[in-house]
């Protein structure tokens, strides 16, 4: 007779790869044109001045400058802008 029970199989053991979302450059930091500021799902943060938006809602800098976070409109939506160096 067997001294141990059979091992059997498990139905667990799978997980998806992390998507590395989030803020990549914070307020007050210098950024170069084309650099990613935020990777996000949907427009949690909206693009402001000198910020572009990709087809996956990634926000990126259009110019070299300093990153600034704020709110816009009556609904107080989060927004990120890039201010040119003066």
UniProtKB/Swiss-Prot annotation:
Biased composition (Gly residues): 1-10
GO cellular-component term (any): cytosolic large ribosomal subunit
Pfam family of the protein (one): Ribosomal_L27
Annotated transmembrane regions: none
Keyword list, A-Z: Ribonucleoprotein, Ribosomal protein
Annotated InterPro entries: Ribosomal_bL27, Ribosomal_bL27_CS
Gene Ontology MF terms in the entry: structural constituent of ribosome
Stretches for region Disordered: 1-22
Family matches, as NCBIfam families: L27
Similarity field: Belongs to the bacterial ribosomal protein bL27 family.
Protein name stated in the entry: Large ribosomal subunit protein bL27
Organism: Polynucleobacter asymbioticus (strain DSM 18221 / CIP 109841 / QLW-P1DMWA-1) (Polynucleobacter necessarius subsp. asymbioticus)
Biological classification of the source: Bacteria, Pseudomonadati, Pseudomonadota, Betaproteobacteria, Burkholderiales
């Amino acid at each position: 007779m067997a001294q141990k029970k059979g091992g059997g199989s498990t139905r667990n053991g799978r997980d998806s790869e992390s998507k590395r979302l989030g803020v990549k450059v914070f307020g007050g930091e210098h950024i170069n044109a084309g650099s990613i500021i935020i990777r996000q799902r949907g427009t949690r943060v909206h693009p402001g001045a000198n910020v572009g938006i990709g087809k996956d809602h990634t926000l990126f800098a259009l110019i070299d400058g300093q990153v600034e976070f704020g709110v816009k409109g009556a609904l107080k939506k989060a927004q990120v802008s890039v201010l040119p160096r003066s």
